Amino acid sequence: MTWRTGCVMWAHKRQKGIFLLLLLAILTLLGGVAEAALPTDEGKADVWRIITLQSYNSRLVTLSTALLGVTSGLVGVFLLLRKRSLMGDALSHATYPGIGLAFLIMTCLGGEGKWLPGLLLGASITGVVGVILVSAIRHTTLLKDDAAMGIILGVFFGAGAAIMKMVSNLPGADAAGMDGFVYGTAASLIFGDFVLILAVTAFVCGAAILLIKEFTLVCFDESFAISQGWPALRLDLIMLALVTAVTVVGLQAVGLVLIIAFLIIPAAAARFWTHKLHVMLWLAASIGGASGWLGSSLSSLLVDLPTGAVIVLVAATIFMLSMLFGFARGILPRAVRQTRLRRKVGKQHLLRAIYEILERDQPDTAE
């Protein structure tokens, strides 16, 4: 047994421990980067104060993004297994015209155009319309999912860009800050936003847990689900509705451009660690929550960095580590397993060749 084989066998017995050690290593690395960027004693004190949630503003933003990460990772697993990773991108872009239309309607009615509940309602409506159109194109034409989602993505984002241009040119309208929904403005989250994210997290996680058996069947074998009488189309729409809810509440935190990364990266990273669905769900939620917590903490320390982008970069770092060291599909463990298999096959071929030679040249000895 080589030392590499021994390391892999040891790691397989301690999967959760190694995964937690990787998260701890990332936390230590980010803390070191933050301390290097803030060399003063006051800056170093801020590192611990922000990471441990002692500051009210940082606590609000960190908890909100962590909850959003947990929910995004959870529903992202079903998107990934359903082979609809592009759906999150299509949905996020489908919400863009709804924000502009809601602003125009509220302004024309004499209200405050930037009233957040109204903007999110408009985003939800157009997001649902986008989901329905994707499903309609898929079931009424010969186009596949990727083509349908690509059409909806381009059309709705183009419409949103045109409407936002009208909003910016509207006389007397205060449209400042509307571009924050594109890239996210997590620093502007208030307590009401935290309550909304908490409520959506509880609802989405509860629905996903209650329907996990049905979602699993639809994700892995839709044809079998239909043959058994399961309402596959209805379950599909419920799943997309949960994704829409997560996308809408995540607009202000990470923006419609980066929300797709928040949905897919944690699920993709978790896929490298396990073949079991319930473990994958737990890992994806943990990776999403850790990415939101670490990313928002680091963004609070380095004020020139946007929160949404930092969160996605942290998630990408965890993804790269998972791609290298993940026990189920990681590059290094898979290379070790392939090397062991080749050696085993080579030994078997060698022994068989020796036996055939002995049997041919010395049949009595071979017997």
Which role does the model predict for each range below?
Residues 78-92, 99-171, 270-284, 298-307:
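Short loop segments and helix-boundary regions at transmembrane helix junctions
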Residues 57-70, 116-127, 198, 248-261, ...:
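Structural signature of hydrophobic alpha-helical transmembrane segments
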